[in-house]
């Protein structure tokens, strides 16, 4: 067969029946992303070489942008475990068309979060202490082990996608390994759902047990504060639509249809339903906190906020109503959900709402004065914190770009773009 010289030089590596841009355009895009990645690497080097003193963190704000970023991307990456649960355990077949992307996004979110934690712990050479000298009375221990194990599960789920590259899969051994991985995928999906559920909850439970921080302290059920359950529900209420948003962004950038509207709408319906369930419990929790728990501690609802915009009540109302109730209604009602503008707006608001929740639970909780001689404190992340965060986003863009170009992520792509 004569070679088609109109195709990119690496066309033999592309998924079967799929077109990609020229290699020169792709390399220009990768170089553009690598500029931001390089800036982040420099910031990471400065942090590792000189310590946390180069950041905006201090003795008052041990948690800041990095922990907010970690908690947000871990929640948004929940589309991986929840979509996997629905696809492989509950056998919702249409999700097979987007599950590969959900797995990659989950892997990027979790691996990126662990990379940020390497910087945030201050002394990465002692990172192994959390495993070897585990504090069995701390919810952070559960978080450490569950995140690590689930990241390994995501790697296992990502490997067969790599092995399905058109050229790699021609090897009989590689083909057999990839096939057997797929056969065992329901097992890994179940393990992933178990691990992710517990670490999502423990991240919330970690805040809920801090009785010295009235903004986040909660009573609960048995050994788990209510924030344990709220974190799980908020994650599954936002993760699926974040996957859809990433997919849509890729479609806009590549000019190709990757997933059918029916699949996106289904993901939105699932997210909207779970978001509404979360909001029911969130409203109940907020009411009980404001009218029962705070008064019993000798505090008032108004003391938890300032009159300014940084720690004002507007963020609570934005989280609950504009970025909570509004997107939930849009995603649940078919007539509203099937309007693309409303659908994508609701998805964006949903993700913003979860990010606000993680921010106020992390930063605002530390800013509130808890002693008579305390005052409201302010926190502003500096360039080193922003640089490291941008590095993770750039890392995700690099891996996702390579995966899209060379791996069969989207089963519907060839059919949707058939001329």
Curated annotation (Swiss-Prot):
InterPro entries: Electron_transfer_protein (IPR052049), NrfD-like (IPR005614), NrfD_menaquinone_reductase (IPR053549). It is found in: Cell inner membrane. Its main location: membrane. Keywords: Cell inner membrane, Cell membrane, Electron transport, Membrane, Sulfate respiration, Transmembrane, Transmembrane helix, Transport. GO terms for biological process: anaerobic respiration. It is a multi-pass membrane protein. Pfam families: NrfD. It comes from the Bacteria. The chain crosses the membrane at residues 23-43, 61-81, 98-118, 143-163, 176-196, 221-241, 270-290, 316-336, 341-361, 383-403. GO terms for cellular component: plasma membrane. Component of the respiratory Qrc complex, that catalyzes the reduction of the menaquinone pool using electrons transferred from the reduced periplasmic cytochrome c3, and which is probably involved in sulfate respiration. Is likely essential for growth on H(2) or formate since the periplasmic hydrogenases and/or formate dehydrogenases act as primary electron donors for the Qrc complex. The QrcD subunit anchors the protein complex to the membrane and likely interacts with the quinone pool. Belongs to the NrfD family. NCBIfam families: mnquin_red_QrcD. The Qrc complex is composed of four subunits: QrcA, QrcB, QrcC and QrcD. Can form a supercomplex with the [NiFe] hydrogenase HynA1 and the tetraheme Type I cytochrome c3 TpIc(3), its physiological electron donors. This is Menaquinone reductase, integral membrane subunit. It comes from Nitratidesulfovibrio vulgaris (strain ATCC 29579 / DSM 644 / CCUG 34227 / NCIMB 8303 / VKM B-1760 / Hildenborough).
């Amino acid at each position: 067969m004569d070679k088609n010289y109109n195709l990119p030089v690496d066309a033999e590596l592309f998924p079967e029946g799929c077109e990609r841009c020229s290699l020169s355009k792709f390399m220009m895009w990768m170089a553009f992303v690598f500029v931001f990645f390089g800036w982040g690497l420099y910031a990471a080097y400065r942090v590792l070489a000189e310590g946390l003193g180069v950041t905006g963190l201090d003795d008052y704000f041990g948690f800041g942008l990095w922990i907010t970023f970690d908690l947000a991307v871990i929640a948004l990456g929940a589309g991986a475990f929840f979509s996997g649960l629905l696809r492989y355990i509950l056998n919702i077949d249409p999700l097979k068309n987007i599950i590969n992307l959900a797995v990659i996004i989950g892997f990027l979110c979790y691996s990126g979060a662990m990379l940020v934690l390497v910087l945030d712990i201050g002394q990465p050479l002692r990172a192994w202490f959390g495993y070897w000298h585990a504090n069995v009375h701390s919810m952070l221990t559960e978080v450490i082990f569950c995140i690590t194990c689930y990241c390994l599960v995501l790697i296992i789920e990502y490997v067969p996608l790599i092995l399905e590259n058109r050229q790699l899969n021609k090897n009989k051994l590689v083909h057999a390994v990839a096939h057997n991985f797929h056969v065992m995928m329901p097992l890994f999906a179940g393990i992933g759902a178990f691990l992710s559920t517990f670490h999502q909850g423990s991240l919330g439970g970690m805040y809920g047990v801090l009785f010295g921080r009235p903004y986040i302290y909660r009573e609960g059920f048995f050994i788990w504060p209510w924030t344990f359950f709220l974190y799980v529900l908020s994650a599954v209420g936002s993760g699926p639509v974040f996957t859809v948003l990433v997919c849509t962004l890729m479609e806009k950038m590549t000019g190709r249809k990757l997933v059918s509207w029916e699949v996106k709408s289904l993901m939105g319906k699932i997210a909207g339903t779970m978001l509404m369930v979360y909001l029911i419990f969130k409203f109940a929790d907020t009411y009980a906190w404001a009218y029962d728990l705070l008064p019993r501690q000798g505090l008032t609802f108004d003391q938890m906020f300032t009159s300014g915009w940084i720690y004002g009540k507007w963020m609570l109302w934005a989280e609950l109503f504009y970025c909570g109730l509004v997107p939930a209604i849009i995603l649940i009602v078919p007539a509203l959900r099937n309007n693309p503008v409303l659908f994508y707006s609701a998805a964006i608001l949903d993700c913003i709402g979860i990010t606000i929740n993680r921010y106020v639970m992390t930063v605002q909780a530390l800013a509130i004065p808890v002693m008579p001689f305390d005052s409201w404190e302010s926190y502003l992340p500096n360039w080193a914190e922003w640089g490291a965060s941008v590095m993770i986003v750039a890392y995700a863009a690099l891996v996702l770009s390579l995966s899209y170009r060379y791996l069969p992520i989207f089963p519907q792509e060839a059919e949707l773009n058939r001329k």
